[in-house]
Curated annotation (Swiss-Prot):
This is Cell division protein ZapD. It comes from Methylococcus capsulatus (strain ATCC 33009 / NCIMB 11132 / Bath). Its main location: cytoplasm. Keywords: Cell cycle, Cell division, Cytoplasm, Septation. The gene is zapD. It comes from the Bacteria. It is found in: Cytoplasm. Coiled coil: none annotated.
Length: 255
């Protein structure tokens, strides 16, 4: 059982994009393990969100820029006697391999899904509340009612179209989250503020709160400074900032 709740806050648009996609990929993979029609509907709905997000962003360019930045920064550590060179070589190899897989992907990532007639018919109806009923999309209804394994295999093929993106994002965010150790801080009266070195490449803030505390963290900020407020309130009440001192673990992630 976990003993902390972790709140994350990206400090630039690229990291926001990566974290949104990370959540959607996890969500889709989770529901694809289920066998019910409702699980499959959730997979398709999540895939539609992924496609919509990718349509507004050049994900190949964003991933390659970030992988190149990480590779360049970590490459400067080669030969440093204070760095585990074997581990560094492994990470640099992973970065290069992820970049090569994205470079080697011809055309738009996920175009096989975007051009699928069944998927397009569903996507066109998702803006309408309840717009994917059987009387709206009988072909979709037929597909959902077929053999579970066949349906799941097709959904898996769709998800796998985005594998280079999912893999690249997982590598980048994994390295970023592991780039620093957490430090215990105290939010006096439920409030904490700290300046950041704008010359440093701070990409992500992580706030870990003991799970037994009755507060949640609200993070806001920019590359110059950030604020953490601890709020309390039930689901049917407007949250208010607590007046107690709150201990939490802060991780400032940068590479």
């Amino acid at each position: 059982m976990k003993n902390q709740i972790v709140y994350e806050f990206p400090l630039n648009e690229r990291m926001r994009l990566f974290m949104r996609l990370e959540q959607l990929f996890r969500q889709a993979r989770h529901f694809n393990q289920g066998g019910s029609v409702w699980d499959c509907r959730a997979v398709v709905a999540t895939l539609n969100e992924i496609v919509a997000l990718l349509a507004r962003n050049d994900i190949k360019s964003e991933l390659l820029k970030e992988l190149d930045r990480l590779g360049g920064g970590l490459g400067k550590m080669q030969g440093n006697q204070h760095i585990d060179q074997a581990a560094l070589a492994t990470v640099l190899g992973q970065i290069d391999a992820a970049a090569q897989r994205i470079y080697g992907h011809s055309g738009r990532i996920g175009y096989q899904v975007m051009e699928n007639e069944l998927f397009k018919s569903v996507a066109q109806r998702t803006a309408i509340p309840g717009g994917t009923c059987s009387f709206d999309l009988p072909g979709y209804h037929f597909w959902l009612e077929r053999d579970v394994e066949r349906r799941r295999n097709e959904a898996t093929e769709w998800l796998d179209c985005f594998h280079p993106v999912q893999e690249g994002i997982a590598l980048i965010l994994g390295l970023l989250r592991d780039s620093a150790a957490g430090i215990w801080e105290t939010a006096h009266g439920g409030f904490f503020q700290k300046n950041l070195d704008h010359a440093a490449a701070v990409q992500l803030l992580r706030v870990a709160v003991p799970i037994e505390l009755p507060y949640f963290a609200e993070i806001s900020g920019s590359k110059h400074r950030f604020t953490v407020r601890f709020l309390t309130g039930l689901s049917n009440e407007r949250p208010v900032q607590c007046s107690e001192d709150v201990p939490f673990q802060l991780t400032v992630c940068l590479l």
